[in-house]
């Protein structure tokens, strides 16, 4: 790749406006997703009746039906190639993503999942942004990404011999898929609502396979547990959370993925309070590194090469 690179301060990026609103949307998504790790870990770790397959069915069975009228109304106005890009969105934030992440949460704590999926997603988004959009992080963002990488590496290495390796691998696969989906959404110019509707509606394809598998525990679940999971999975985590994050991407561009690294902080606190998953010294240091990294990543600039 040839050309010159000029660093643009984050507050003056010329390709996006509405920074304050973008931060608000990003923080809304962060709050919802932090709780999702705790709520989902509670279910799939044996504390509840529902399993990973049930949670994914609730998540997209409900949100897909809610957003189906939206997609039908907006379909004629979608940009060319939107349906092709939608496949990337489904893989990176739809039913396959949610199923792999939920299965990983059976094997590793909520704090690990939150650190290794939304925590490392900015690293993958930065890499794919460089390849597909010609973006390069400035010095401050680069330092932030380095701190995120260091925190994640410390967490993985410290628990490599404790049976959590498969869970960690699942979390990192999800982070990579999410990162490329984010970049491709930006490149395609999809509006936040369109991207969310495409992801949730196309993920409805999971439901028939779920029903035919005979793996459902919905009828056996207590009404209270079913109601909590239906609202959190089907409305908050999918429709509201995805819409908020996609809106943040539209307003903040390359800086939006950085805010997701705040999720480990809130998820770790929530898991300690509600699930008795008290972090050890390594987890605390890793989360601190990730939190510092996201702050630098959000404040730093982006270089456009070309």
Language model segments and positions:
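Glycine-/small-residue-enriched transmembrane alpha-helix faces in small-molecule transporters
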Residues: 1-57, 150, 158-187, 206, ...
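Hydrophobic transmembrane alpha-helices of multi-pass small-molecule transport proteins
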Residues: 6, 67, 128, 137-157, ...
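Hydrophobic alpha-helical transmembrane segments of multi-pass integral membrane proteins
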Residues: 20-28, 52-70, 85-88, 144-147, ...
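Specific transmembrane alpha-helical segments of multi-pass solute transporters/efflux pumps
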Residues: 32-39, 68-117, 126, 154, ...
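Membrane-interface helix-cap regions at the ends of transmembrane helices
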Residues: 35, 39-42, 46, 62-81, ...
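Hydrophobic/aromatic residues within transmembrane alpha-helices
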Residues: 43, 55, 59, 104, ...
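A helix-boundary/kink motif common to multi-pass secondary transporters
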Residues: 48-52, 109-110, 133-138, 191, ...
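Helix-helix packing/entry segments at the starts of transmembrane helices
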Residues: 58, 94, 98, 112-120, ...
């Amino acid at each position: 790749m040839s050309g010159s690179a000029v660093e643009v301060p984050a507050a003056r990026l010329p390709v996006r406006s509405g920074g304050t609103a973008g931060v608000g949307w990003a923080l809304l998504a962060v709050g919802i997703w932090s709780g999702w790790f705790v709520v989902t870990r509670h279910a799939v770790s044996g504390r509840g009746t529902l399993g990973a397959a049930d949670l994914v069915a609730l998540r997209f069975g409900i949100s897909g039906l809610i957003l189906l009228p939206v997609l039908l109304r907006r379909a004629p106005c979608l940009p060319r190639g939107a349906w092709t890009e939608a496949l990337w969105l489904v893989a990176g934030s739809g039913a396959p993503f949610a199923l792999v992440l939920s299965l990983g949460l059976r094997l590793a704590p909520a704090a690990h999942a939150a650190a290794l999926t939304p925590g490392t997603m900015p690293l993958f988004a930065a890499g794919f942004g460089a390849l597909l959009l010609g973006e390069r992080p400035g010095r401050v963002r680069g330092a932030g990404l380095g701190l995120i990488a260091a925190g994640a590496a410390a967490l993985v290495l410290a628990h490599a011999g404790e049976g959590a390796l498969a869970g960690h691998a699942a979390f990192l696969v999800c982070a990579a898929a999410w990162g490329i989906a984010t970049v491709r959404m930006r490149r395609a110019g999809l509006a936040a609502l369109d991207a969310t509707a495409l992801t949730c509606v196309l993920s409805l394809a999971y439901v028939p396979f779920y029903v035919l598998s005979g793996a459902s525990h919905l009828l056996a679940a207590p009404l209270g547990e079913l109601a909590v999971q239906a609202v959190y999975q089907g409305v908050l985590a999918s429709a509201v959370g995805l819409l908020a994050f996609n809106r943040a991407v539209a307003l903040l561009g390359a800086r939006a993925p950085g805010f997701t690294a705040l999720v480990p902080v809130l998820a770790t606190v929530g898991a300690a309070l509600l699930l008795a998953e008290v972090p050890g010294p390594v987890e605390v240091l890793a989360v601190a590194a990730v939190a510092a990294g996201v702050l630098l990543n959000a404040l730093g600039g982006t270089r456009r090469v070309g």
